[in-house]
């Protein structure tokens, strides 16, 4: 089984483009990542055959439009889910199997198994109207995994749960999705969920694909600033890109930093001598007590501290703008800043696209 999307375009009734030349390919689990209104839901609706679009959607090599709706074997979960309020949880779960003509003796073990996986076994005989909203949403999700459809489309399935229940809901969906033998497309705003559930991803921004590939590549080798920032904890400043003796360097915070990339790694050597965006993560910035450094550099003090994941994040006001640094303790003295060269990304000032060859 394989899903291919080729140069898919979709316009809103107003004429505004919802999706522009979107392409992806997978035979397993793929994440579609992007902020609200990035085009995730529109893409899933196109794959499901619910929108008119230009381009191609191929299901196991066959064009979507050539496959009768009842033969596409696509199941999908959108936020506007529904359950039968006056039917039991068991009946709600069993419904898709029952309409396919399966016998009770075949249905019951499947329902029992999914109910156990999703924490619904003890409420199987309850009518849905007795359930909490979180439980109703869980029923709708669990129902999706009762049969092993070839193509499963999940639109931010954990997003509608309460804060308390969302983590557990994601864990259950992840476990069920990874057990499936078919294709799973998992759309989410949550970069952490995407990292956990899929090895490959498509990053959408305002209907355009900004990067495809592994989540690891997106983290360490982002194609655009918006991709880098989606993971959080990202600094960016402008500096002049220089070259000397076959090496690239920038001057940050009063220190010359030789980069891991060379001029040959640039998309164009025209960038040398010009302002570029220099990006790096909070964790890639180190502070060195001004009394210990021998390498020069400008001196700073933290202006304020935040706490995040058990660590302090210190704010530093510099000549290049505000910088944030992860630190284990609140440091009160003067220091210089050092940025790890291997973690530096370079971007074009206007397009905010990467300057280096992937």
Identify the residue ranges that each predicted region occupies.
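ABC ATPase NBD coupling module
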Residues: 63-76, 99, 218
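Short helical segment in ABC ATPase nucleotide-binding domains corresponding to the A-loop/adjacent helical element
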Residues: 90-98, 108
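Conserved ABC ATPase "signature" region
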Residues: 105-123, 174-175
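Conserved ABC ATPase signature
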Residues: 127-131, 135
């Amino acid at each position: 089984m394989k899903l291919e999307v080729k140069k898919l375009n979709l316009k809103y009734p107003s004429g505004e483009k919802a999706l522009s030349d979107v392409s992806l390919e997978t035979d397993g689990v793929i994440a579609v990542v992007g902020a609200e209104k990035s085009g995730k839901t529109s893409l899933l609706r196109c794959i499901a055959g619910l929108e008119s679009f230009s381009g191609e959607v191929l299901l196991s090599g066959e064009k979507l439009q050539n496959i009768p709706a009842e033969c596409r074997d696509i199941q999908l979960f959108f936020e506007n889910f529904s359950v039968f309020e006056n039917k039991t949880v068991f009946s709600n779960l069993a419904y898709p199997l029952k309409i396919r003509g399966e016998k009770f003796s075949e249905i019951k073990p499947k329902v029992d198994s999914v109910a156990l996986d999703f924490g619904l076994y003890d409420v199987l005989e309850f009518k849905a109207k007795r359930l909490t909203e979180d439980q109703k949403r869980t029923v709708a999700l669990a129902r999706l995994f009762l049969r092993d459809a070839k193509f499963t489309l999940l639109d931010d399935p954990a997003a509608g749960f309460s804060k308390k229940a969302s983590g557990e809901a994601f864990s259950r969906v992840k476990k069920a999705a990874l057990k499936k033998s078919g294709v799973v497309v998992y759309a989410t705003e949550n970069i952490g969920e995407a990292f956990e559930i899929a090895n490959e991803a498509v990053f959408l921004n305002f209907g355009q694909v900004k990067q495809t590939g592994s989540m690891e590549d997106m983290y360490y080798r982002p194609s655009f600033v918006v991709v880098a920032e989606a993971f959080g904890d990202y600094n960016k400043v402008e500096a002049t890109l220089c070259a000397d003796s076959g090496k690239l360097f920038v001057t940050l915070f009063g220190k010359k930093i030789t980069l891991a990339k060379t001029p040959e790694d640039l998309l164009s050597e025209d960038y040398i001598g010009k302002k570029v965006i220099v990006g790096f993560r909070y964790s890639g910035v180190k502070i060195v007590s001004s009394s210990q450094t021998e390498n020069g550099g400008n001196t700073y003090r933290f202006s304020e501290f935040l706490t995040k994941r058990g660590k302090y994040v210190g704010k530093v006001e510099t000549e290049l703008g505000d910088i944030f640094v992860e630190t284990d303790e609140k440091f009160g003295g003067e220091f210089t800043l050092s940025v790890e060269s291997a973690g530096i990304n370079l971007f074009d000032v206007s397009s905010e696209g990467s300057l280096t060859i992937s």
